Amino acid sequence: MDGNDINIQKNEFSRDQSALLMMDQHSDHKNHESAIGEPGMSYTASQPALSSTEHQTPLVSEASVAAPQNHLNGNSHESVSEMDRNSVDFAIESVLMKARAYNKMGAPKDPRRKQHNPKSEPKIEPHVTDSSDNQAAMSNKMEAEAPKMESNQNYVSNGSEPPFRFVSISNFDEMKTKKKEVQEELKLEVDSDSEEDDVPEQKTPKESDRCGGCGKFTHEDDLIALEEEKKKEKEKPLMSKKKSHHHKKNDFQWIGCDSCQTWYHFLCSGLEQFEYYLYEKFFCPKCVPHTGHSIRYKVVAPHRYRWYSPNEKHLGIEVGSKTWIEDFITRENTVPSPTDDEVCIVEDGYEFRREFEKLGGADNWGKVFMVKDMDGLNMTMPKPGFDLEDVVKIMGSDYEVDTIDVYNQSTYSMKLDTFRKLFRDTKNRPLLYNFLSLEFSDNNEMKEIAKPPRFVQEISMVNRLWPDVSGAEYIKLLQREEYLPEDQRPKVEQFCLAGMAGSYTDFHVDFGGSSVYYHILKGEKIFYIAAPTEQNFAAYQAHETSPDTTTWFGDIANGAVKRVVIKEGQTLLIPAGWIHAVLTPVDSLVFGGNFLHLGNLEMQMRVYHLENAIRKEIRSEEKFYFPNFELLHWMYMRNVLLEKITEANQEGSDMREQEKNIWTASQIMKAEMERWMDRELRLGPEKNAILPTDDKNKIMISVRKQIEIQTKIQNAKNKPMGLKQKRKSRESAERDDEDYCPSSSTAYKKKYTKKAKKDNDDAPKVKKAKKEEVPEEKVPVPEAAGPSEVTAPLTIKIGMGPTEDQKGVVQIFNNQCTSSGRKVKLNQNVADYCGSHLEARVEEIPEKATKSFRELDNELERCEAVHSGEKIKKVKEPKPPKQPKEKKEKPPPKKKEMSSRDRLMKKLKM
C-alpha cells in the first residue's frame, strides 16, 4: 500500500486533543509502537483501506507531511523518510510532528485545513467504561509519568527537539478535566447522526494541482470563492418536503479521474448533483471515449440508505430503502380505510361545494375531501394527452429541479431532461427518483395550463396580497400603495409532481400547516393519513427527532393512520395539519399546490410551532418551510385585517355579528405577532429580515388600538340597557301609582323648576319636537235591549303618513353609505323619531334640501365618532377662494362740445 493511501488526513485533532492523546505515550520515545489512548478507551490510529464498494478516502501528499516539519527549529528524533510508510509508525509520527508544530509555532497556516469537513470523516469509536477503577488507574499513571514529563525539558535546554511536547497544565485535576472534555466530544461525534453521511468523501489533490475543467481555482481558492458567492446571493429555500444536503458545498469538492489522474471540481466534472456519490471509478469526459462510462458502486446493502457500504450489511432495515419498499408494497393494503368523519368522498365539484358549505365552509374545514370528477371545481388542468415531455418542452430541458433519491431518502438537483430519460427507461431502474417541487408560476405558458380550484384562489392569503397583475385587484393595490414586490411572494400554489413506480415519500406535515389540492393527471397515488390531533403531533415530533430510521410512523401511531387511494382524474383536498405519507404504485404525473387561509389559521400556527420545535431539536437548517411565513402574516394584518377592524369601529358595529371569522383570525394573529415581536426585541432581527423592526412595531401599535376599540364596542353591547332610558318613564310611573308620595327633595326640585320657569318667562322659548300623535276615534256602541251596562269605549288607531321632517330624515339615511358601500348604522333616536317610516325606506325626494352634502358628511362623521368613543375633531371649513374682480375699462373721455359763447370767451382771453 502506498503511503499516500493512508487515511491520516481525516484524523486531525485540535491542539489540546493532540497533546492530551500524546500524554499517554510510552516514556521511551525511541519506541514508536506504543499504543495511543488511555485506560478504558481505545483509538484506531490508522484506518484500513476501504473496500472497492466504498467511497475513495482523501489522500495525503508528502507536502502535507512536510508542511508542519518546516516550522521546527530542531531536528526531529526520527526522520519520516527513514520510516516504513506501510506501518502504523508513520501515522503516529505524523500526529507527533503536528503536535510539535502546534506547541512551538501555533497552528501552521496550511490551506488544506480550511476545507476540512469533520462531518465527512470516519468516526473515531471510543470504547469507554465508566468504572472508577479505570479512572483511578488513569490518575495513577499520570502521576507516575510526571517525572518523565519534566525530563523532556532537557531536550530544550540541550538545543534538541523532543519527540513530542505537552500542553502546559497547572495540575493533574485540570488535566483530567481536559481529557474528559475530549472524551465527551468524541462521544458526541459518534452519537450524532450526520446529514452528510452519504456525501462522497473528499479527495485531496496536491497544492500544485488545478481543476481540469475550469483551471482557475486551487484548493484554497475554492472556499474563498464559495464564501464570496454566499455573500452576494441569499440562499433560497429548497423546494422539497424532505431534508436536503448542502449541495453548494459539494460543488467545489474534488474528484479525480481514475484514468488520467486529473483533478476536477464536482461542478466542472460533468456530473450532476445526484451522481456525486454514485461512482466507484470516475472517468472524466476526455477519457470516456477510450475507457467507457464511469463505474457505479455495487449494491451491497439494499436495506440501507448507504446501499453501497459493506459496513452496513448487518444493520436494520431503514424506512424508504429498497428492501423496505418492496416489503411494504406487499402488506400496505392492510392499513385500515378512513371513516366518514375523516374523509368525505363526493362525485364532483358541485357536490363538494354543497357538502363543504354544509360543514361550515373554509372557516370550519377539518375533513379531507376526495372529488372523483373535477367538474364543478372551476379548476384548470391540461388537456388529455399532456405528458412529461410537454413539461420538459415548456420549462426547458436544462431546467434543474430538486429531485428525491428514493432509496437514499435525500434530495439532489437534477435536470428535467435527465429525469425524463430515467423516467422513460422502465426496464433499467437501479434507483428510483421523483420530484415534488417543480413550481411553475413564473412560467407564463405553464401557469395558464394548470390553475388551482376557484375556491382556493378566493380564500388564499397569498392570492389576496399578491393578486394577478392582469386583474382589477392588482390595480386597486397600486392605487392604495399596498402592492408588495413579486420576489417576496411565496410561490407554492402551482406545483408539478412526477414519480416513478415504487417511489415512497415518508410522513410529513405540509410546511406552515398549509392546505393542499392534489389532482392526478396520470397514474395513481396512495395516501396514508393521520388526523391533526395533539396525540398524533406528539408521536410525530418524537418520530422526527429520533435518530432511529427503522421504525414506520404508522406502527407507533396506535391505529391513527388510514389509507386513501386516488386514481387518475381524481382530486384530493387536504386541510391544515394532516400528517401523511405517499406511495406511488405506478408512474404518475400530478398537479397540485399549497395555500394558507384564515379558516385554518389556528392549526397553521400550531404546525408552525411544531416545525420550529423539530428544527430546534435536530438543529437542521435545511428543512423546507413555507417561504416568508411571518412576513406574509405581518402584511396580511396590515393590509387586510386592520382595515376591516378599523372600518367596523368607524361604523360602531360588532364584528362578532357580521364578520366573526375576521375577528377570530385577528385575535389569533395578534397573539402570535406579539410573540414574534417579543422574540425580535430580545434576540434581535433575523438575518436577511425583509420588514424592519420599526415597521412591525408601528403595525402592532395600530392593531392594539383598533382591537381595544372593538372590544369596547362589544362590551357596551353586552351590558343591559342603561338607567337613563328607565328614568324617562319615571313621571308616568309616578302618576300611575296612587300611593306614591314624593320626598322632600323631589318636591323641592319640582318647586324650584316651576319657579325657574316663571322667572325665565322673558327668555326665548324653544319648541320641542312633538312625538307623533295618532288620533283616536271613538265609535259608539249600540245599547243592548236588556238592562244598561257600563262599557269601555272602543278606540281605533289610524296610521298617518310621514311628516315632511320624517321624509327628509329617511331620505338622508337611505342615501348615506360608508367608503365600503355599507348602509350607515342608524342612531336609536333617529329610529325612534321616524318610527316605521324609516323601516319602510320610502324613496321620496324632499322638495327642498334641508342641508348641504358637506353638512351631512360632517354630521355623519360626528355620529360615528360618538359611537366609537373618539374625540370629535373640529375642522374649520375652508373658505372659498375669493374670485378676483374684473377690472372695468374706463371709456375714453368724451370731447366737450364748445358752444358759441365758449368760443367767444376763448378769443377774448387770447
From Swiss-Prot:
It holds the Pfam family JmjC. Changing residue 409 to A: Impairs histone methyltransferase activity. Residues 25-35, 118-130, 200-210, 758-780 have a biased composition (Basic and acidic residues). Its cofactor is Fe(2+). GO terms for cellular component: nucleus. Fe cation binds at residues 508, 510, 580. Residues 748-757 have a biased composition (Basic residues). Changing residue 510 to A: Strongly impairs histone methyltransferase activity. It is an enzyme of class 1 (oxidoreductase). Residues 1-11, 43-58, 150-160 have a biased composition (Polar residues). Changing residue 495 to A: Strongly impairs histone methyltransferase activity. Histone demethylase required for nervous system development. Specifically demethylates dimethylated 'Lys-9', 'Lys-23' and 'Lys-27' (H3K9me2, H3K23me2 and H3K27me2, respectively) of histone H3, thereby playing a central role in histone code. Promotes mitochondrial stress-induced longevity. This is Lysine-specific demethylase 7 homolog. It comes from Caenorhabditis elegans.
